[in-house]
Amino acid sequence: DCTRMFGACRRDSDCCPHLGCKPTSKYCAWDGTI
């Protein structure tokens, strides 16, 4: 299972593919990959 866009996270691996964890806001956002 993975965290979707704007879901809470602690690290990049928590997030779904093509999403990364924003360290300041602690949510998953697009990491720029396709």
Swiss-Prot record:
Residue numbers bearing the Isoleucine amide modification: 34
* GO cellular component terms, semicolon-separated: extracellular region
Q: What are the UniProt keywords, alphabetically?
A: Amidation, Disulfide bond, Ion channel impairing toxin, Knottin, Neurotoxin, Potassium channel impairing toxin, Secreted, Toxin, Voltage-gated potassium channel impairing toxin
InterPro entries, per this entry?
Answer: Huwentoxin-1
Expressing tissues? Expressed by the venom gland.
Q: Which GO terms describe its molecular function?
A: ion channel inhibitor activity; potassium channel regulator activity; toxin activity
- What's the miscellaneous note? Negative results: does not have effect on Kv4.1/KCND1 and Kv4.3/KCND3. Intracerebroventricular injection into mice does not induce observable neurotoxicity symptoms.
Name the chain's protein: Kappa-theraphotoxin-Sc1a
What organism is the protein native to? Answer: Stromatopelma calceatum
